[in-house]
Amino acid sequence: MNPDNGKPMERMLYEVKKVIVGQDHLLERLIVALLARGHILVEGVPGLAKTMAIKTLAESIGGEFKRIQFTPDLVPADLIGTRIYNQKTGEFNTSLGPVFTNLLLADEINRAPAKVQSALLEVMQERQVTIGRETFKVPNPFLVLATQNPIETEGTYPLPEAQVDRFMLKVLVGYPSTTEEFVIVERMTSALQAVQQVLTTEQLVALQQEVDKVYVDPTLIEYAVRMVTATRRPQDHGLKELEHYITFGASPRASINLILAGRALAFVRGRDYALPQDILDMALDVIRHRLVLSYEALSDNVTGDDLLNKILKRIPVPTVPLREQANGRRIQNA
């Protein structure tokens, strides 16, 4: 891997930050998901620049951006497309839906019925759509950012655990600081700077392939697995007091995504090998939405993040000598 390959990520962030103030965590996670071929579930109140963040990111890579506002009257055909009868020709023509884009914002995904949510999640997983007898692949790269409003829950359709598990990351977005909000108001009430394209979609796909080559030491895989299995059996890690708070822990998909996301984060940070800190930094965003908490946790006002922070503190951080990392990379690249 060329060490300079991390620099396009820096230029991309620079361009996005011309428009977006703050939200560094969300922006970094967007890039990680894009490089790791994952999708993001974002939870936050309206007005925190979620739409603008992904739209600006699309501009920086020369990709196509589309937004779907999820509502109770939405049907799957509104997402994936349908076949329309042409009276002039007497034939059916296929009209592709808005999921055929590079970056898709699924706004307030929990406001649409389960069959619509399932249609989107199927596209996310399969990266293709079948309409009639024809199958159409979505463009590459393809990233879905789905949002949920944590305040308004009346009239919503909560995502089932099996579907939430399909998202690589769940990111919590909070309010900006006073200083950041001042800059936001100042910037949004004047002419915005133009965002320059720093990559093509083809170059981004090439970078995804470079991320696949980032070396992950077996001890880091063991570290990730221990984190995830601790959510299923906290008593095995000296955390028996957490057992009654967790009904179901994270699935093996969490371990897989933790390695994929940690590898992409290492690439963003300019390395061709992952460190324990990369795995640790991604742990909350990868695991938090995969926990099913008990009623006791809800009654005691205990959140998934509270439990995860205790688990992460208990799992010992492995030491990976730099010499072993270099040897591993040489073997891998041989």
Per-region residue spans from a language model:
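Walker A/P-loop
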Residues: 34-71
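Conserved beta-strand position immediately N-terminal to the Walker
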Residues: 40, 104, 142
